[in-house]
Amino acid sequence: MAVHAHPDDESSSTGGVLARYADEGITTVVVTCTNGEYGDGPDHVKPGEAGHDPDQVAKTRLAELETACQILRVTHLETLGYHDSGMADWAYKDDGHVFSNVPLEESAGRVAALVERYRPDVLVTYDGPGAYNHPDHLRAHEVAVEASRRTGIPAKLYFIARRRRDWERLRERMAEAGIEMPAPPAAMLTPEFLRRMEETEQRITTTVDTTGVASRKRDALAAHASQLDQSWWVRFPDDAFLDVFGQETFIRAEDRTGEPVPEDDLFAGLR
């Protein structure tokens, strides 16, 4: 079970493992907490600009999410329907109805109920405060951790993590391909961000080979066309995409299997 903040996060952060484990016959569940209302509108208009309709954006993004999950062969998709909170420096995050302001007792309770229903051996979500502090990502982390704690069902809890060298390799391969890195992520690649990424890298326990399903991850990303149609995600040459995104890396935060780390399989010790 992967607990995500917005439509498209399932593909960018865990598309490889979702596709790989689905191909291995493992039941996969994606929980998407928000509708992504504050994503781009038509012609990439931003929230607050003329032509941006949050409700229509949500409708479009949820349809794209369904398509992406079909490409990744996700067994079950669960959408919680909470309202996108927007970026950390946007005023929307202060609205009482957005996901990051919904009481943890409520949102974690809903995810805990899904954990009880599907009884996943492995639960995956984001890392806590660190390099990327989007309010909805932080809340999804809190919700998933609390759901795991309440139920005691997952044998393993993982946090999504990228290595500093992955970001540096991304920048190199984009330059080689003549693709300008937009902001974000260009604005994120500050010395402080890279320092935090290096700290995160030291905590990584698990590296999963996803080269065999990289094309499906890319196709799933392309399904989110309203957000990514001209994105570097989909413009990257095939060999560069495989080089940078042929692995997905995680921090094993909780474990009841006793399996040693480092490991190369989220299900190590469970089969």
Where are these regions (language model features)?
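Metal-dependent de-N-acetylase/amidase catalytic core
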Residues: M1-V3, W90-R271
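Active-site rim/loop-helix segments in enzyme catalytic domains that contact anionic ligands
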Residues: M1-R119, E146-R150, F241, I251, ...
